[in-house]
């Protein structure tokens, strides 16, 4: 079984999936969402969960640097509750402080153009979040 990693934004949802052994995370795709209209890409997530045999979902939890919860962290908590209800799978909130920055640095180091970075940053951030979670399980 595999673990799904998600990086929730206001307009996009970064998606990553683990290998079957739960050792490595790969960025999968970025789903366009509209949180204001309540569109969280659940239909596409259902297809991914079924296709990859996902048994656990990890959602990035963007705490403030001092550990407190701001509006984005609270949005992630609501999203996690929605996922639990929709998919009946364990959902783990995982501290994602600086994950997008780490993904951005990796892409810059790989000499990826700014235009291409914009297209892949969310799925890369999801992969960073998921890899951190997977590493903690070893």
UniProtKB/Swiss-Prot annotation:
Keyword Hydrolase assigned: yes
UniProt keyword annotations, A-Z: Cytoplasm, Hydrolase, Nuclease, Ribosome biogenesis
Record Pfam families: RuvX
Transmembrane segments: none
Gene Ontology terms describing biological process: rRNA 5'-end processing
Origin superkingdom: Bacteria
Coiled-coil ranges from the UniProt annotation: none
UniProt xrefs under InterPro entries: RNaseH-like_sf, YqgF, YqgF/RNaseH-like_dom, YqgF/RNaseH-like_dom_sf
One GO cellular component, as annotated: cytosol
Cytoplasm recorded as keyword: yes
Gene Ontology MF terms: nuclease activity
EC numbers for this chain: 3.1.-.-
Subcellular location: Cytoplasm
NCBIfam families: RNAse_H_YqgF
Cited function: Could be a nuclease involved in processing of the 5'-end of pre-16S rRNA.
Similarity comment: family membership: Belongs to the YqgF nuclease family.
Family annotation (HAMAP family): Nuclease_YqgF
Name the UniProt record assigns to this protein: Putative pre-16S rRNA nuclease
Species classification: Bacteria, Bacillati, Bacillota, Bacilli, Bacillales
């Amino acid at each position: 079984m595999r673990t799904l990693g998600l990086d929730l934004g206001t307009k996009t949802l970064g998606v990553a999936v683990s290998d079957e052994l739960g050792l490595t995370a790969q960025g999968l795709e970025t789903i366009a969402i509209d949180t204001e209209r309540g569109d969280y890409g659940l239909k596409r997530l259902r297809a991914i969960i079924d296709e990859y045999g996902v048994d656990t979902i990890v959602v990035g939890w963007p705490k403030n640097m001092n550990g407190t919860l701001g509006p984005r962290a609270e949005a992630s908590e609501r999203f996690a509750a929605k996922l639990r209800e929709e998919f009946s799978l364990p959902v783990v909130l995982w501290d994602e402080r600086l994950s997008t920055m780490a993904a951005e640095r990796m892409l810059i180091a790989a000499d990826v153009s700014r235009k291409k970075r914009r297209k892949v940053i969310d799925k890369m951030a999801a992969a960073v979040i998921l890899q951190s979670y997977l590493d903690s399980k070893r």
